[in-house]
Amino acid sequence: MSPAHGNRLGTPESPNATTLLLLGSGELGKEVVLAAQRLGIETVAVDRYEHAPAMQVAHRDYIIDMTDATALREVVQQEDPTIIIPEIEAIATDELKRLETQGYDVVPTAQATRLTMDREWIREFAAEEVGVTTNEYAFADNYDTYRKAVEDIGIPVVVKPTMSSSGKGQSIVRESAEINGAWETARAGSRSDTGRVIIEELVEFDSEFTLLTVRHADGTTFCPPVGHTQQDGDYRTSWQPHSLTTEQRTTAQQMAQKVTDGLGGYGIFGVEFFVQDGTVIFSELSPRPHDTGLVTLSSQRLSQFDLHLRAILGLPIPDIDVERPGASAALVVDEPLTRPAFTGVDEALSMSDVDIRLFGKPEAYPGRRMGAAVATAIDIETAQERASEAVDCIHVSDDKT
């Protein structure tokens, strides 16, 4: 991975264009595209369905099965991009590695993309090779092994596929009657053919947070911690800065640096932690902008998306501070919608220091994030109230006209 692309940025839709190929075109990818276009970068969005959010703002788009190595290679060969940015896990990562050996820049690296999509690898790497503190865990690829792992760790446990995203296939076992159902849920939600699951000790944590970690040519820079809440393993609210002691913050930074150094490459990493009885515990890592980091659209002068592009291109990364305490809240629907329409946006935007992001997803299903509110205030509590109230103003329904 070369960090020197920023030494010469071309002109979009011309022979000298600097071209970014985005694999995965959801709401986070959309913000990456917008940040790239502010730097005059030509953008190409790829996903498995038409009218994905990032496609709506990119110069060009392709609809393919990104797990199909042949289809992926054809797009890359046709576009010959300067940079390839994977934004989701469901990609033919072996093909990415082959493309990288042929000279294409994959962010942060093809190997990091492959390894971090696998909870088994990243947990064993973090706990056993790097030596960071994690909760107790085990893996299983058959029911008998799974059942024994649950018994050994002890209920309550969290059960997840080793490969999935956004909480898919995740559930909590709080009593014996839920063991079978959790196994079936994890297997059904897996993005791999192995059907392997991870069984984790349920951490009754005091808080959870994300440390947005920027690896760049001059070293590693950390954003102020982002606190967050989740429901069914998926982001619901976040705020920045999240309160930590100096010791907790230092510990988290040391862990994040060790793990991201082991992965290599440049860009932003979302490193998740729990705090339990004052102890910082490593949870998960994503080698890309993080959903909880949507709050940085309002709280930082440079959002996580701006920082991601700067790090990738080899542009300067300044010290990162919170301009003003900020919060975000996700707009989540609870029913299937084929033509989503939004009302109440005017009411939400009448609130002080509130902004709205409607992601532009072409359809909805229960639990799908369709937008978010971001807010700032004199303190975290007020910012959280504003973001939550703004989301509550907005209603999503099928447009029957």
From Swiss-Prot:
Positions contributing to ATP binding: R119, K160, S165, S166, G167, K168, G169, Q170, E200, E201, L202, V203, E208
Entry's EC annotation: 6.3.1.21
Residues that hold Mg(2+) according to the record: E272, E284
Pathway noted in the entry: Purine metabolism; IMP biosynthesis via de novo pathway; N(2)-formyl-N(1)-(5-phospho-D-ribosyl)glycinamide from N(1)-(5-phospho-D-ribosyl)glycinamide (formate route): step 1/1
SUPFAM superfamilies listed in its UniProt record: Glutathione synthetase ATP-binding domain-like, PreATP-grasp domain, Rudiment single hybrid motif
Keyword Metal-binding attributed: yes
Assembly and oligomerization: Homodimer.
Role: Involved in the de novo purine biosynthesis. Catalyzes the transfer of formate to 5-phospho-ribosyl-glycinamide (GAR), producing 5-phospho-ribosyl-N-formylglycinamide (FGAR). Formate is provided by PurU via hydrolysis of 10-formyl-tetrahydrofolate.
Name by which UniProt lists this protein: Formate-dependent phosphoribosylglycinamide formyltransferase
Source organism (scientific name): Haloquadratum walsbyi (strain DSM 16790 / HBSQ001)
